[in-house]
Amino acid sequence: MLQKETQKWGGDPAFVDALNSVLTGPADILATRVVSLTKAYSTPFSKVKAAGNGFTIERHFYKEVTGEDGKKNRLEIFPGMKLSVGDKITAEYRIWNQENRSFVKLTAPREASFRPSDQLSGAYGWWLRPLAVNGVWSVTPQGYRDVKTDRTEYWFDVYPEEKTTVTEDFFITQEGIFTAPVVTIESLYAPHYRANDAYSGEVKTVK
């Protein structure tokens, strides 16, 4: 029933077997009720803390750098580090999902100085890619990438469980001090399963 709560089964005959197993189960199972409460409020970016139910999400930034050997590498960016106009930046959204879920939306706001290297919306994902961290492999789920003026939205019909990574490349186009809302992920089929990252601070850019 947990899977039924977060997945669209459609006309799969397995639904009948699952329903029968519940109806013939113990009385305490039949007495189970689920209540979902939602609260919306406003708070300054700086006070937003990481939170989640069934999901976790983190955003990490990396700058493309060229080593002495001429090979391109990635340097992780931490709060307080200055970036320059023209720098190529990769945003990496690291997601953990407790269960396979249907109809999931990832919303990734961006600072005004960031311009996506690929500004066209379209299909996204379903490849294996090596992470720079510890050389492990990560699955990139398949979905649709919708590029908007201030954010990128990712829509997934099915989102796999466990650890996945979504990435996006940007170029720095303006100098100044910039900030943006936190990245969020949510199951549209069961909205009480969601997560947001903590506020990561301002981004400073120079010419």
Give residue spans per PLM region.
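Long, domain-scale non-catalytic interaction/scaffolding regions in large secretory-pathway
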Residues: 1-207
